[in-house]
Each structure stands twice: as C-alpha cells, then as structure tokens.
From Swiss-Prot:
InterPro entries: Atp25 (IPR040152), NT_sf (IPR043519). Gene3D superfamilies: Beta Polymerase, domain 2. Keywords: Membrane, Mitochondrion, Mitochondrion inner membrane, Transit peptide. This is ATPase synthesis protein 25, mitochondrial. Residues 1-32 form a transit peptide. It is a peripheral membrane protein. GO terms for cellular component: mitochondrial inner membrane. It comes from Meyerozyma guilliermondii (strain ATCC 6260 / CBS 566 / DSM 6381 / JCM 1539 / NBRC 10279 / NRRL Y-324). One of its GO terms (biological process) is mitochondrial gene expression.
Amino acid sequence: MLSNIWRRPKRLSFRYLAPIAHRSIAQTKNLVTKPENIRNTEGSENNDTVQSELPWYLRDDAASPLAETAQVELPEVPESAPKTINSFLELVAKDYGFDNLVFFDMTQLDSDHDYSTHHQPAKYILIASGKSEKHIMKAASQLRIHIKHTYDHLPSIEGMVTGGTSPRARRRMLRRSRKGPMATDNEYGKAANSWVMCETGVDGLFIHMLTADRRQELNLESLWCREEDAWRYEQQPAKAENSDHIFSGVRRFHTMGPFYMATKGKPLQKLLNSDSSIPGVELKGLISDFEKSGDSTSKFEFYRIIHLLDPNLVSLKSLANILISSKIPKIEAVVAYMKVLMDSQEIAAPEQTTAAMNESVDTRLDFLSQFVSDIYAYSGEQIELVGHPELVPLLWNLTVVNLKPHVIGSRTIDEAIHNEIEKEHFGNYPSVHIASNRNRDIYDLISSYNEAHSLTPTTSFKEMVLFTYGNAGKWDKFWSTFEVSFNLLNDQEHQTMTKWLRLVVYLDLRNDPVAINTFLNKYWSRSFPSSVTDLETRNFESEKEKDLFKTTIQSILQKVETPTSAEIQTTIDRL
C-alpha cells in the first residue's frame, strides 16, 4: 500500500529546462532588437518600462553613485618619533580602513608614571577602531605579512583568532565530543578578534585594534594618558539594558571587575592619601556603581577605602562580614582587619586624653577579638602568631595611639642612614600614647607564646618595642629594653657598631635632652660596657656609617652640655 501512495518523483533532467530556456532567450532578443526598445542616449520616456521588462542580467547598472569616502584624520606625531611611526599610521588608516586613531608617546610620560618606558617595553602606542571582528582579523593578518616582508621578522600578535583549526585541536575536540562543551567555550558576548594587539617590534610601537563597543568598554586611553588629560576619557556608568537574553547581565559583569579598580580605585586611593574630601552623595554613587559591576575580587579593598573616607557609609561590622564571606585565607583576613582598625575613624579617640585613648585601644582589641572568634568559629583551627609576619607587629601597634603624623620607626632610621631626611619633622615631645595595661597584656602574650614555642623575638620587633617606648617618652623602659633586648652585657650576635649607630641616629632625631644626657653619661663610659669600649674592639660596616656616626655624635653634643663633652669630641676626632 505504501508503495502505491509514495511514488518516487521522476528525476529532474536538463531536457525539461531546455524549452523554457529557449523561450526566455527568444523573448530577450525580441526586446533588444526592436527599434522602439533601443535605449536613446538623450533619454527615453519608456526607458524605465523597458528596463523592468529586461532580465536582471541585461539591465543597466542602476546603483547609486558612491558616496565620498570620509577622510580619516591622522593623529599628530612628535618630531622626535621615528619615521616608521607615520608609515604605520597611514597603513592602518588608509590601507586597512581603521578610524578614530589615538596615538600615545610613552617616552614623554614622567618616570613615576605607571606606564612610562621605565616600567614597560612600549615606546609608542596606537589605538584604532575597526568595523567588525572580521575586519580586525583580516587587517591583523595583513599587518603581520607586511611587517614580515618589510622588516624581515614576524611580529607578536595577541587576541587574533583565525578560522582554521589545527589537527591537534580537532583531535582534542573529537575526544571531548561525548563530554559536552567546555565552560570556557562560552564567550559571554566577548567575540573573538574584538581586541587584537600587535607588538610590531619596530621602534617600540604597539598597535591595538578594537571594535567600537569593545574599545568603549575597556577605555584603554585612560591607562596611558597624562594625568591632566584623564578627564577626556572619563566614562559615565553604563545603564542597565532591558534584555531577555539569559547572559545580558553576565556579558557586562564578566570582565568589568578588574577594570573597575583601575579606573575608580586609584583615584579613591589618591584621595584617601590627600587632605581633600569627597561628598557623601558622590561616595554613595560610587557604591551603587560598584554593586552593579558585580566585582568580588576587589570588594574589600573598595569598601575599606570608603570606610576610611566616611565610616558612616560602611561600618567596621560590614567590613568584617565582607572578609568572613571572602575566600582569602583566615590569617590574611585577620591581618587586613587589623590594619583597618589601626586607621578607622569609627573607633578613634574623640580627644587626646588618656582616658579617651585608652578606651579607643580597648575598642580596637574588642573588635579584633570578636572578628577572630567569628572567622575561626567551627573551623577547628587556631590562630598562630607566627602564621603571618605582620601579625605580631600589628598586635603591638594596636595598643599604641599616634599623637603626631610623623613617628620615628625602623624605616625612618634606615632612611636617615642611607639618605638624608628632614629632622624638623620630629620634636622632643612624645609622638605616641601607650595604653599601658593593654600594652603589657599584649607583650606578655607574645612573650609567653615565644617561650612556649622556643622562639626568639626578631631584631625588628625588639627595635619596634624600643622605639615605641622612646616615642612615648618612657625612657626608663627604653633603656632597660635596650640593655636586655640587645643583650648589652653579653652581646655575641652583633659584632659591629650597627646597633650603636642606629641608637645615636634615633636620639638625634628624637631630640630629647633627658635621653641624650643618659646616653652620654652612662653609655659613653669605660666603667660600663658601652659604645666607647665597643669602638675599640668593633668596626663599622662601611666608611659611610663611620662618618655618619661621627657627625651624629657631634650633632648630639651641640644639643646638651656635659662635663665629658671635650673627651667625647677627642674620641670622635681619633676615628
């Protein structure tokens, strides 16, 4: 039955089309050979009718005249640039059809700029917009061939994806054919060849070819421009699109995060380091933009800056929740939170009174205790003081409140020894306040931990404790710490004059007459193991340190008068 219903049609043969073709050709000949159908050079009223009756392949070309090609404006090139730069500009604009060219001379950037020639290999950067991904791919291929034949080397091209598939890739895809597509196969709207970079290898020129949408999103110009031209490339936050596509949001958020801190985070950090302020309304706008970006990698850093600018917008509790929900190691989160506690205005002392500053230190430690309890809850882990090199110093500094912006520390001494610093920054008044009870508790905690684990405090930590007592004006503790911590009576570790050099440099910067008199009367005496006895048995690490020691002692002698000043000066002159 099925064979009667379903009959195979006869095979279509050319002989069925032959009569149709002959009739069409005959009609065409009649239309062309008739005198009334011959086109009049002066114009004929029936021309349109005749043209419509003719087959398409015999009609006159009715295309509209070509519009004048827009001239691409080439950017200005400095006279100091090589001649090859102009040739590449003309090649990209005129031969390859790119427009909106922007040229950056990286050699003219300041040495401290992040993208100056001191920090990266590019001397000149050209940015151009292509018409499509296919246009960019074709132009990049031609550019590679041009450089190969003109300059006799192959350039490095990144971001270009050709249509060809290597045999190795085909075999790999064949093996994966039964496993489904890889997650990386999804481009989330970032089409291949939307951004191609060519390192020409000619006079340090780098060429970036992008589609218009990709170029607007990346905003590469803001990275390489001068600071005074940054306003030219500022972009307004993109408005949310009303789309039913399932990746309408993912497409935008997929690569926006890393670029957010590059464009927004740096200005915020600079503002944080300056004395200027920013209105709360603008900060709320930045928070809204950041939430839309979906960036999770720099979330804590962003909100940390906002908190330091205005703690009313982001509280310490909110920062703690961000750290707890993040994926960073617990010990790293604790250190980051401790740094925030050091600078937070939310728990800062309202006035520089002993009671207010002690209460501020108590609040710091309470916040830290609660955070450590929350982040280590149900984990079965315990915080180790040696788990991070910054943990012990930060724990000590949490019990100290700075009274002045400039405080003498180990780094200050290093700068004074190796460079010249302005001593006017430091006065003879205490620059820090120590919460004595909490400070003693923390010191006992650190000492007990070291004793239980057979650890020895590092030299940097001992020096930090020493300078803290000196900065607070607690000279009794300062000298007792110096004798014990630096093992003055039986010093087998330090066989040079380095510790004495650092001590006299600190006393010179601290400029306290009481401390200077104690040093000259007690630690410059032959009746006690002192700097004088060490001068006879030990050497300086360099002649520069020796000269600095002499000039520093002379500076100290000018600040106070002691009966032994003449003897000390004689000893210094003999060095």
